[in-house]
């Protein structure tokens, strides 16, 4: 909609109008470091807002995917809430190995005053048998996913044991 495509401050809209405002932030290689999406209902989505939520294109400083790093509401100072996502990332600049990127945890809620988070959902993975590892290339870069989701645990932060654990497989 405005600004120079791919640079900090550029403003975008969705192809089918949703009345969301998308703003590019910072710079990483040949594009933005992150994006902020503000929706008409007051939610603010941050993509690539943390190092672990940026998926790099091989050894390049250019990002090939921006994962959701935070969701927050637009409430006034001191009253807003947020959900924070963290990732296991083997596609970070300077440490590109398998090119894989997978969710590690989701923490919630965090308030605008910094209180919390109080709860966390943790994701645990195991290594797949070598014969079952999907391998491919994306934009000329190796992408192997040797991991499979093994367990999901819901935790009160600071508690010794999870509230609930789901074993998969």
Predicted regions and their residues:
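Conserved catalytic cores of ATP-dependent inositol ring kinases
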Residues: 1-169
């Amino acid at each position: 909609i405005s600004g120079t495509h791919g640079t900090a401050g550029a403003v975008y809209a969705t192809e089918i109008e949703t009345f969301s405002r998308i703003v590019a932030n910072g710079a990483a290689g040949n594009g933005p470091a992150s994006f902020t999406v503000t929706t008409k209902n007051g939610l603010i989505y941050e993509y690539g807002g943390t190092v672990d939520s940026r998926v790099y294109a091989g050894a390049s400083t250019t990002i090939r995917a921006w994962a959701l790093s935070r969701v927050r509401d637009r409430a006034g100072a001191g009253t807003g809430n947020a959900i924070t996502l963290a990732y296991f990332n083997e596609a970070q600049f300077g440490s590109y190995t398998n090119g894989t990127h997978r969710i590690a945890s989701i923490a919630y809620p965090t308030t605008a005053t910094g209180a919390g988070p109080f709860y966390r959902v943790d994701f645990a993975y195991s290594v797949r048998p070598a014969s079952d590892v999907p391998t491919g290339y994306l934009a000329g870069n190796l992408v192997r996913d040797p991991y499979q989701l093994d367990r999901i645990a819901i935790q009160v932060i600071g508690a010794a044991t999870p509230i609930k654990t789901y074993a998969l497989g």
